[in-house]
Swiss-Prot record:
Name of the gene this protein is made from: cmk
Enzyme Commission no: 2.7.4.25
Residue ranges of coiled coil: none
Name under which the protein is recorded: Cytidylate kinase
Predominant cellular place of this UniProt entry's protein: cytoplasm
Transmembrane segments: none
PANTHER family: CYTIDYLATE KINASE, CYTIDYLATE KINASE/PANTOATE-BETA-ALANINE LIGASE
Species this protein is from: Streptococcus thermophilus (strain ATCC BAA-491 / LMD-9)
Top-rank lineage group of the source organism: Bacteria
Amino acid sequence: MKDIRIAIDGPASSGKSTVAKIIAKNLGYTYLDTGAMYRSATYLALQNGLTEENVPEILDQLSQYPISFGKAADGSPKVYVGDVDITHPIRDNQVTNNVSWVAAIPEVRQELVSQQQRIAQEGGIIMDGRDIGTVVLPDAELKIFMIASVDERAERRYKENIEKGIPADLETLKKEIAERDYKDSHREVSPLRPAEDAITFDTTGVSIDGVVEFIQEKAKKIIDKG
């Protein structure tokens, strides 16, 4: 039995992170939240009043305050910049609405991608994002591209925000998600698209358990072959 690398890509709020975390726990794999890394870079930029005109300064912040992952007492993942816990602040709407321009900076992507590739070398890892199967882990043994309707994704984000006590308006979320889709799929650097050998899975109307089961079955076939 071998440890494989699983890449899950897809648009915002398609359920990638939720599914990836469950599968990582079930398989005993490491979950590397790439979206959280870009959110962390965005958080650092916003905290320091930086824009796309300040690329060297953003890279300097990433060097001074490296991004790392840990676990809370209940096993849930935590995200740090330096020694500061930013697990919750990086889910703020201001960060969400600015992450696209930070993620589109080639030098920022290059720095974070090299960190991700180093971590994934040993296998036994699951990563989700926008370009894992195409750029970060083009040789991953299993690649999944998850899609879902804008309405369903807005509903998911709305429920998540309400549960976390974050104010939310459903129509605003629909508009923001549609705009994010356009930005992510039209950016010059690593646009959102499925890898040629990815399995595209429309999760509209499919339960989280159903999605997890589908991906785990695919993973186990590959693991058993090894």
